Amino acid sequence: MKKPIGILSPGVALGTAGGAMSSKFFLMALATFFSFAQVVIEANSWWSLGMNNPVQMSEVHIIGAQPLCSQLAGLSQGQKKLCHLYQDHMQYIGEGAKTGIKECQYQFRHRRWNCSTVDNTSVFGRVMQIGSRETAFTYAVSAAGVVNAMSRACREGELSTCGCSRAARPKDLPRDWLWGGCGDNIDYGYRFAKEFVDARERERIHAKGSYESARILMNLHNNEAGRRTVYNLADVACKCHGVSGSCSLKTCWLQLADFRKVGDALKEKYDSAAAMRLNSRGKLVQVNSRFNSPTTQDLVYIDPSPDYCVRNESTGSLGTQGRLCNKTSEGMDGCELMCCGRGYDQFKTVQTERCHCKFHWCCYVKCKKCTEIVDQFVCK
């Protein structure tokens, strides 16, 4: 598989004819241009494929890849090339992105930053321009979502370039158990996710030691952490065969873990993420050298998190005003922490739930609908 070609090459020769003042203004304009270009780069993301209508994604290979791949919002040049080559993969890239976004929102549902999406191709807004631990989690869980979706699509025969898993038989599998079936092709899912997701970072060129180069290294590390988490959590699944459920024979195969398990593991990594900085050789190193170096499965970040308590257009924080909170909780979902000490308002709402359920022979459950008035609390 060919590597995407880098597209950013900001080498510019400056003439001297205009004098010192002209050169000064030219340099200022150039700096402004690249600052704007960086914002544009960060503002567009392949994550937007997870926000599209599924019909639009499936049309990529029905109508023909050439025009649609160029029109898909958020793809870098390298990712567009991969779209042209692997038309049938794009629907599952979108499914993987959607899986990652949903898992992010589940894991952070009780946090001040709750992985909210915005209505543009950045998906998460300006907050992703900050190299925070929240950004680290988002990159990791999105990359993990792509591995998950691609591996499953291979197993289900949806892709022309892969099929069932060819993973080697585990050494600890009992000798009388058969290794076969059609397992999730995690090897292929991992490789393609790496090629596609990392393409944007690898084609960006920035000066060694710059903030932008540190962000690239951070993003690549967290992408890999997400992929590795899916890979390492995959396990052997087995099915019994035999007369009357005797299980005299077992067939086993490699199977993806439930994605909630992946999200839980990455959330733990988020809580213990390592603060990093660039050293003189242009490598990421820990800010606190007394701690163990992060592994390939750990998350890393280079910026402190912004204040998520109040709305801030420059950082992308939406604030917590209007968020529901739990009056009795002392955790992050509690009104004291969620509302950042601003207090909360109380209102009553009507909830309808299934109740008084009974099992009827044979074979259904019949329930009544019960309504109750409950108190809810929202941050001021």
Swiss-Prot record:
Entry-linked CDD domains: Wnt_Wnt5a
Gene3D superfamilies noted in UniProt: 3.30.2460.20
Keyword match Lipoprotein: yes
SMART domains: WNT1
Chain positions carrying an annotated carbohydrate: 114, 120, 312, 326
Signal peptide: 1-37
PTM notes: Glycosylation is necessary for secretion but not for activity.
Propeptide section residues: 38-61
Pfam families: wnt (PF00110)
Single GO term (MF): protein domain specific binding
PANTHER family assigned to the protein according to its UniProt record, in alphabetical order: PROTEIN WNT-5A, WNT RELATED
Subunit field text: Forms a soluble 1:1 complex with AFM; this prevents oligomerization and is required for prolonged biological activity. The complex with AFM may represent the physiological form in body fluids. Homooligomer; disulfide-linked, leading to inactivation (in vitro). Interacts with PORCN. Interacts with WLS. Interacts with glypican GCP3. Interacts with PKD1 (via extracellular domain). Interacts with TMEM67.
Protein name (record): Protein Wnt-5a
Chain's gene name: Wnt5a
